[in-house]
Amino acid sequence: MREHWRTFKIAAWLGWEMDSNWTEPALFILYSVIKPVASAFILVLMYFILFAATGRPQDPAMFAYIYVGNAFFIFVGGTLFGTFQVIQSDREWYQTIRQVYTSPISFYTYIVGRAASKVIVAGLAVVITLVFGVAAFGLQLSVSPWNLPMFVLVLFLGLVCLISIGLCLAGISFMTARHTHGLAEGIPGLFYVFCGVLYPLTALPAWVQGVGTAIPLTYWFQLTRALILPESTMQSIDTGLGSDSLGILAILVVSSLAFFLLSIGIFKLGEHLARKAGKIDMLTSY
């Protein structure tokens, strides 16, 4: 366990250095602030254009639903890309995977550590987006001290699920040459459509709703909204998932554990096949 913790810390430090060394710290912090604010402006503009085009009155509850869902979706793109692009970057760009892989560490833990910096940056962006929404657009949040422990637990479970999905994709990327960026955009895009990020599942056809309810992140988005938005806001929107937070939490716990175990299996399988085929450190000049 001590070796895993040591590997995680060093990999997290390395990931942070690689993410932030392209500029001065002050400029990096400024960039980290401006990016989520700009994304929030784009979302708000889309919201106003949509309601203006349909001639419908603006709905503050739906705006809060959309805004909070989009804010927490920042974790999805950042965490997934930060997890499964490690193999591609170390093998193709920096060509250091041979040295790292043959060192006496757990490569699985190393990738989790490398993703930690992406999680931290994404967390900062989520906080900035929510604060900006409250200050600029009158977003109403209701964070009860009694809900904080459950919120921390839900956030942790969601990140475990995201990192596990990323590690499943990392196991696949052992055997692929140039599909990292396609996966980085395609997989989060699927979650964006099917997990009720911008609209409730009830807005989708029945068969598509079945796809959404099979994805753990759907329940994660539902719980994060339920824990930080006013109860009246959530009651005014039919999400199709019910209002039993403990039941939804139980589903999230089981599915996160299942994806964690699945990630170990797929990662080890991809690693085994890549070693057998001699593709661990094989360059594709891409």
Question: Model-found features: residue ranges?
Answer:
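Hydrophobic transmembrane alpha-helices and immediately adjacent juxtamembrane helices
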Residues: M1-Y286
